[in-house]
């Protein structure tokens, strides 16, 4: 039964890690430089499944080392090499996550394939430095027991403690501190988010824009009917319905400014209600509120241009600027500024990237937690045997 379970684990490990390597190398969306860590880690796991576990299984089932003594020394060195490489790979991945979160702009420019390959090479060199001493320094192995040969790890106390610290305890401490730091940063940004939440533009909550000085507080925004009426006035016709207020020279000579422009001093006289040159910002806000559930991420923008006269304001535009957006309503047509889609897309793209980073960090934290729990009993007992023989 044990042999069947271990054999299944060997096949599952080889198949699963081969799929990881194949996915990273063939999928365009997974060709990010940091995914090279996963390729190298999967290669180390495949080497463990093919060169280490089968011989360990045979040694456990037979009760002695069936193979040659030379292969026993190589086997033990490879065992330490591949297992240490797997643990240090996880440590390097956690540091990569930490730098990506804390130094996003600076580190993303430095996260090149060449830099990642250099880090991977350093990981393998660290594992080699920890695994090679038993091959070079034999130490006092003591008399060989009579009977069947055994293949055991180096029993030197200094090597046991040094290899345990370098292979497990130091990387484990680094990973715990790094992921704790990432968690605190994510929690701080989550608590800060509702206070500074202002949409793609980075502003605060929506507030009504100030009305220009001299404008009536009850002034209505232009509608299609008022636009047609203003056009009729420009052609010499009077309004079909409604009362018309007297127009002062100041009102006729000064065009109304958008509500988002700074207020100008005026004589305190009320301006004409229904003028098409008035601000269209409030109407745009009303329409944005109606379509907020259907189109998330919409950002209000200032009017693109200020018409010189009511007639020109009410006339349909002959040509719209490229990249601009038009909000058509039952009361008229509002031309929103260009660049809104670009700003919104950048904000949502950045938010999606941060979400993926957090999700990937959470998955790695779970994997590393399980990995540490699986390795801790062995390294604890292995180190305890050197301290208390």
From Swiss-Prot:
Keyword set, alphabetical order: Cell membrane, Disulfide bond, G-protein coupled receptor, Membrane, Receptor, Transducer, Transmembrane, Transmembrane helix
Any one GO BP annotation for this protein: regulation of smooth muscle contraction
Extracellular-side positions: 63-72, 141-156, 388-389
Classification via InterPro entries: ADR_fam (IPR002233), ADRA2B_rcpt (IPR000207), GPCR_Rhodpsn (IPR000276), GPCR_Rhodpsn_7TM (IPR017452)
Disulphide-bonded residues: 72-151
Domain of life: Eukaryota
Region listing for Disordered, in residue ranges: 194-216, 233-320
Comp. bias intervals (Gly residues): 196-205
Site (Implicated in ligand binding): 79
Keyword field contains Lyase: no
GO molecular function: alpha2-adrenergic receptor activity; epinephrine binding
Localization (cell): Cell membrane
Major location (coarse): membrane
Composition skew (Acidic residues), residue ranges: 280-302
Cross-referenced SUPFAM superfamilies: Family A G protein-coupled receptor-like
Biased composition (Low complexity): 255-267, 303-320
Site (Implicated in catechol agonist binding): 163, 167
Transmembrane annotation, as ranges: 1-25, 37-62, 73-95, 118-140, 157-180, 364-387
GO cellular component labels: cell surface; plasma membrane
Family per record: Belongs to the G-protein coupled receptor 1 family. Adrenergic receptor subfamily. ADRA2B sub-subfamily.
Function per UniProt: Alpha-2 adrenergic receptors mediate the catecholamine-induced inhibition of adenylate cyclase through the action of G proteins.
Subunit structure: Interacts with RAB26. Interacts with PPP1R9B. Interacts with GGA1, GGA2 and GGA3.
Record's protein name: Alpha-2B adrenergic receptor
Gene: ADRA2B
